C-alpha cells in the first residue's frame, strides 16, 4: 500500500482530559483463528451498533505453525502470511507477529521461514505491523533488518514486580508492555504512572493461570523449547485446576481478571486504553465468547451468534 505509514500513536484518539475515550482490544489468533475473524470482522464493520461504542480492535496477534521464533503458545493455522495480513489490512487493523521465544541463540536468527514472515509483514504502510517479543537478541536483529515494525514487550517475561514494569515501560524500544497479570489490580502504583507510560501498558485481561503460580516462566520456556523442536521433557503444570484446562468462568474468578466493568469504570478513567485478550491455544468457540463478552452489547450478543453460527437447524447433541 502506498502512502505514509501510520503508527499506533496516530491510530489512537486522545480526548485531552487525561481519561481514555477508547479501549483498544488486542485479540488472539491472527493465523490460528483466521476463519473466525473472516466472519467476525465484516460483522463488526457492518453492524457497529452491536458493539460498544467505546471499544476498537487495536490488533490481532499470532504466529503460524512451525514458527521457530514463536513463543507463549505454539502457533497454528492453515492460511498463509499473505492471507492473514490481507485480512487485517482490509479492516484497518494492525497485525502483530508473536515472536516471543525466550531461548533464541544467534544461530536461530538466520531461520529462513521466520525471516520471510517478517519480510511480508514489514512491507505494509498502514496500519503498521507489530512484533510481540521477549529476546533482546531478536529485538536488535529485527530493528536492524526490518525497521518497519513496532514492538510489544511480551508477558512471557513475567514482570511481577512493579519496579520491573516501570523499567520496561521506560525502554524506548517498546511501544507497548504487557505486564504479568498479577500486577493488574495494583491501582495505587498504576494510577501514579506518567500519562506517556500509561499509554504503553497493555493489560492481559482474561488469564486463567493460578494467581499464586511460581512456575509461569518455566511454562513459557517449555513452549519456547517446543518451537525450537527440543527433545527435552515436557513441562507439566501442577497448579490447582490445571487438569481442567482453560475455563472462562474460572478466569473470571481470578484476582487478576479484568471485566468489562473494570475497563469502563476503573482503567479508562485512570487513562489506560490497551487490553489484551489471551486464547491462541484455545478453540474458536471460546474466542467467540471473549468477543461477545468484551466487545458486544449484551442485547446484541444473540444477533452476533445468529450471524456467525446459530440457526434453527443447529444440533448440539
Question: Positions of the model-derived regions?
Answer:
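Active-site pocket-lining/capping segments in soluble small-molecule metabolic enzymes
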Residues: 2-168, 173-317
Amino acid at each position: 500500500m502506498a502512502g505514509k505509514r501510520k503508527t499506533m500513536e496516530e491510530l489512537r484518539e486522545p480526548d485531552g482530559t487525561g481519561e481514555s475515550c477508547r479501549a483498544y482490544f488486542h485479540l488472539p489468533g491472527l493465523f490460528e483463528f483466521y476463519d473466525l475473524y473472516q466472519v467476525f470482522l465484516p460483522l463488526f464493520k457492518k453492524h457497529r451498533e452491536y458493539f460498544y461504542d467505546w471499544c476498537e480492535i487495536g490488533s490481532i496477534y499470532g504466529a503460524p505453525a512451525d514458527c521457530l521464533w514463536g513463543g507463549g503458545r505454539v502457533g497454528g493455522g492453515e492460511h498463509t502470511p499473505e492471507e492473514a495480513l490481507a485480512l487485517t489490512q482490509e479492516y484497518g487493523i494492525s497485525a502483530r507477529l508473536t515472536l516471543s521465544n525466550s531461548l533464541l541463540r544467534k544461530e536461530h536468527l538466520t531461520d529462513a521461514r521466520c525471516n520471510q514472515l517478517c519480510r511480508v509483514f514489514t512491507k505494509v504502510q498502514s496500519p503498521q505491523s507489530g512484533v510481540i517479543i521477549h529476546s533482546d537478541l531478536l529485538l536488535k536483529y529485527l530493528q536492524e533488518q526490518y525497521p518497519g515494525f513496532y514492538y510489544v514487550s511480551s508477558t512471557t517475561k513475567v514482570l511481577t514486580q512493579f519496579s520491573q514494569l516501570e523499567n520496561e515501560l521506560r525502554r524506548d524500544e517498546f511501544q507497548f508492555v504487557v505486564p504479568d497479570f498479577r500486577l493488574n489490580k495494583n491501582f495505587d502504583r498504576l494510577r501514579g504512572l506518567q500519562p506517556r507510560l500509561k499509554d504503553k501498558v497493555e493489560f492481559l485481561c482474561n488469564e486463567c493461570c493460578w494467581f499464586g503460580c511460581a512456575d509461569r516462566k518455566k511454562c513459557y520456556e517449555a513452549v519456547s523449547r517446543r518451537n525450537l523442536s527440543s527433545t527435552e521433557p515436557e513441562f507439566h503444570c501442577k497448579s490447582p485446576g490445571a487438569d481442567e484446562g482453560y475455563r472462562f468462568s474460572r478466569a473470571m474468578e481470578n484476582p487478576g481478571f479484568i471485566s468489562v466493568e473494570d475497563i469502563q469504570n476503573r482503567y479508562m478513567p485512570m487513562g489506560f486504553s490497551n487490553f489484551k485478550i489471551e486464547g491462541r491455544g484455545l478453540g474458536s468457540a471460546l474466542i467467540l465468547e471473549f468477543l461477545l463478552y468484551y466487545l458486544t452489547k449484551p442485547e446484541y450478543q444473540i444477533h452476533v451468534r445468529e450471524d456467525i453460527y446459530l440457526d434453527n437447524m443447529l444440533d448440539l447433541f
